[in-house]
Amino acid sequence: MRIEFTIPVNPRPKKNSPMILWRKQDFKIKIGARILATIPFTPFIVPSKGFSDFENEIMPFLKRLKDEAGVIDYPCNIQAVYYRSTKHTIDLTNLNEALHDAMVKSGLIIDDNRDIIAAHDGSRVFYDKFNPRIEIIITELKDYIQWNDTTTEQIKLL
């Protein structure tokens, strides 16, 4: 099986400038069993606004693709060619992670572990100032051995 599609968004990495927020809940600083201090707020990390905006832009495309192609629960190669609107230094690994996390959140793929996303062969980053986009080709890998039976795992999730 081969699925090809283009998403007309400017790709954003997930790990750029995450925000640290505080939740109103006791946070204990410990060494062993001994509590050194108690702070009335607990820190937690959320993705940057840029990534949240990217995820909101990409989600309708991924959900529509899931409705058309179904859920991917088999080993596949996800080739993603990213066209960015700027020439800023960018990490391909972080772009892939952002895309894969969005694919899981949309329900298009059941997980982004090695049993499902077995390869990223052919992924690249290019510059296109006037037409930023992500061109994606998902190809099923027939000769790949999964460590876990993902179809059984998927049934458990439903």
Predicted ranges, named:
Residues 1-158:
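Acidic, proline/glycine-enriched N-terminal capping motif
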